[in-house]
């Protein structure tokens, strides 16, 4: 039995918060009808919903957070992957990161796709045709390999080409179910792939995971200034939301020819690129990953680029990023990716 998008099947029953019935759309600067400031904030003055929000049931802690915390208690490390702009290869990088961590057979890795409207992880992992199964223990992730599992809304769509046209609250509800109802079991690493920008999904993930502990976020950019412009906003978002920044990764830094291994600059770092930005913003720089056309091919075929092309400069760069991230979260890089795995 697979969960339905119309009537999701929760693995646990828990009381939900009471949301007021509004008589008008929420204005632009609304603090949120379920927030502590609902009906009381300066932005509420003159709003048709002010009396309704102010008199609704007092807001308390989300009752699902303790359930989520308990559910995720067997996961040692939780890592967010963020980007300020779309198209920088964030989801591709998330899949590469997951494969690289899982290249150590002693590690068990989960990859959660929270890009509700643009899920691409199942395609990249080669499990696009799979569906989610539900048991008394919860939703079962789709296992790509023996030690690498994935979860995405794509597994729940009746037609893989169906558009998901949802507003924030419904997307947030599904993300909550991913965290509350998915039976990951014992994991060494849970990598959470997020949509670009600083949207509702990011706020939900941060709020719901805060109690269970998030190790931090890896921010992905490309060298050109148009990407760095939004990365600065992403860094500011992390600092305001209290999310630790593990570091910045510069993706697509140069094109590596598979034939001769020469490197050509495709996206020129007109303002110094990711390394200079990281230094200026006071965050760690985790490394640059060159552009290899075989990365796209591996993702299209749902294969592990790291395993298929271990000698590629891009593979070596990804493994070095994994070692850097491991060090940032308090793990021994030589145990996460032993020398024999690095040499493969």
UniProtKB/Swiss-Prot annotation:
Stored Gene3D superfamilies: P-loop containing nucleotide triphosphate hydrolases
Binding site for [4Fe-4S] cluster 2: 257, 260
Subcellular localization: Cytoplasm
One Pfam family matching this protein: ParA
GO BP field: iron-sulfur cluster assembly
Keywords carried by this UniProt record: 4Fe-4S, ATP-binding, Cytoplasm, Iron, Iron-sulfur, Metal-binding, Nucleotide-binding
Keyword Transport (UniProt): no
Region span, Disordered: 1-41
Alphabetized CDD domains for the sequence: Mrp_NBP35 (cd02037)
Cofactor(s), names only, from the UniProt record: [4Fe-4S] cluster
Keyword Metal-binding set for record: yes
The protein's assembly and partners: Heterotetramer of 2 nbp35 and 2 cfd1 chains.
Name of the protein this chain belongs to: Cytosolic Fe-S cluster assembly factor nbp35
Protein's organism: Aspergillus clavatus (strain ATCC 1007 / CBS 513.65 / DSM 816 / NCTC 3887 / NRRL 1 / QM 1276 / 107)
């Amino acid at each position: 039995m697979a969960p339905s998008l119309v009537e999701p099947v929760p693995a646990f029953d828990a009381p939900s918060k009471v949301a007021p019935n509004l008589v008008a759309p929420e204005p632009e600067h609304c603090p949120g009808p379920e927030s502590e400031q609902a009906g009381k904030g300066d932005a509420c003055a003159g709003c048709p919903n002010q009396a309704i929000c102010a008199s609704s049931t007092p807001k308390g802690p989300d009752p699902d957070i303790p359930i989520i915390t308990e559910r995720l208690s067997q996961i040692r490390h939780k890592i967010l992957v963020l980007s300020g702009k779309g198209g920088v290869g964030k989801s591709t990088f998330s899949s590469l990161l997951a494969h690289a961590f899982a290249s150590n057979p002693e590690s068990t890795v989960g990859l959660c796709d929270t890009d509700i409207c643009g899920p691409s992880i199942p395609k990249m992992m080669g499990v696009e045709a799979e569906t989610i199964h539900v048991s008394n223990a919860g939703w079962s992730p789709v296992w790509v390999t023996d030690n690498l599992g994935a979860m995405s809304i794509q597994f729940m769509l009746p037609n893989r080409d169906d558009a998901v046209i949802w507003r924030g609250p419904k997307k947030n509800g599904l993300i909550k179910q991913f965290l509350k109802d998915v039976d990951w079991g014992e994991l060494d690493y849970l990598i959470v792939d997020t949509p670009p920008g600083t949207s509702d999904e990011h706020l939900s993930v941060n709020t719901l995971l805060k109690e269970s502990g998030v190790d931090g976020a890896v921010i992905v950019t490309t060298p050109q200034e148009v990407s760095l412009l939004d990365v600065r906003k992403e860094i500011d978002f992390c600092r305001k939301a209290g999310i630790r920044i593990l570091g910045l990764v510069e993706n697509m830094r140069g094109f590596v020819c598979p034939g001769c291994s020469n490197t050509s600059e495709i996206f020129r770092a007109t303002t110094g690129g990711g390394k200079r930005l990281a230094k200026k913003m006071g965050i760690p720089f985790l490394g640059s990953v060159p552009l290899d056309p075989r990365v796209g091919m591996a993702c299209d075929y749902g294969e592990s680029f790291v395993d298929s092309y271990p000698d590629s400069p891009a593979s070596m760069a990804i493994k070095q990023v994994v070692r850097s991230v491991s060090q940032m979260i308090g793990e021994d890089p030589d145990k996460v990716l032993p020398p024999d795995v690095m040499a493969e």
